[in-house]
A protein has these predicted regions:
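Metal-cofactor-dependent catalytic cores
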Residues: 1-275
Length: 275
């Protein structure tokens, strides 16, 4: 089993980028989901309700993050924490009262114009503290603006198995980017990521925190921002439900980085171990 791909998404729900190597830090993959778009009340926005977010490119260069979109120009902000930046109180899922740094009026105006409502861009600073709430979490396990865990793992074999079923039902195969993974595996059986208690990648250890439940974002074309019908959720519902939670469907696995430092590279060997 090896690493087939590595991806980071600098701003939650905006476009991500493939990287040849990912550095692990206290919150997961460095640079991943360290920024968040929020409304005036501090509530987070995602593609679930704002599919146009899929049209915004993100580019990291040095200490800068640039957002751009066709016909909308671009805006650049710093990735470095700023003690002088005003703080915003933000909420994401079960976490409320999180303190994040406001990235300033230029980013807010650019995103507000693009999304058609008043929004703000915030970034993680030294006052940010968000513990992982999964049962597998240990004291001190933290994460950024991810949904459920610091690292989302999917295997190529799992996607192939899903697409085989979709095509058997007359549908079109879906690409990996619909699932917005961080780590893509190759050389393993379908859904092997679900069953691996621990993944070891050189000096980096990842701990399994359970299967990832999927939402309407998986039906959104990540290049055009269009909703494209009911797949893959319709097919996932036929074979990827949990009897204990029949309202959800699952694809990919949530992992917590037990290691708070280290580097993972495309092509690295991956070993599955018992807990």
């Amino acid at each position: 089993m090896r690493v087939a791909g590595l991806f980071i998404y600098p701003v939650k729900s905006l476009r991500g980028c493939a990287v040849p190597a990912a550095t692990v830090d206290a919150l997961g993959f460095a640079g991943d989901r360290r920024f968040l778009v929020v409304d005036d009340a501090g509530k987070f926005l995602t593609q679930r309700t704002h599919a146009r977010m899929a049209l915004v490119d993100t580019r990291l260069a040095g200490d800068s993050l640039t957002l751009s979109a066709d016909g909308a120009g671009a805006v650049t902000v710093s990735t470095k924490p700023d003690a002088a930046a005003p703080l915003r109180t933000v909420s994401i899922w079960k976490h409320e009262g999180l303190l994040a740094e406001d990235c300033g009026p230029a980013a807010a105006e650019w995103l507000s114009a693009f999304l058609g409502q008043s929004v703000h861009l915030v970034r993680i600073g030294p006052k940010f503290h968000r513990p992982v709430l999964k049962k597998a979490a240990h004291p001190g396990d933290l994460f950024a603006f991810n949904d459920g865990s610091p690292v989302l793992v999917v295997s190529e074999a799992s996607l192939d198995a899903l697409n085989d079923r979709i095509q058997e039902n007359g549908g079109e195969p879906v690409p990996m980017n619909r699932f917005r993974p961080n780590l893509v595996l190759t050389g393993c059986a379908a859904f092997a990521e679900d069953a691996a208690p621990v993944l070891r990648l050189g000096d980096v250890v990842l701990r399994n925190a359970g299967k990832s439940d999927r939402c309407i974002v998986t039906t959104t074309d990540q290049l055009t921002g269009e909703r494209l019908g009911k797949e893959p959720l319709r097919t996932l519902a036929t074979f990827r439900r949990d009897p204990a939670d029949p309202s959800s469907v699952y694809f990919g696995a949530n992992f917590i980085n037990e290691s708070k430092s280290g580097t993972i590279r495309v092509g690295d060997a991956v070993d599955a171990h018992p807990a």
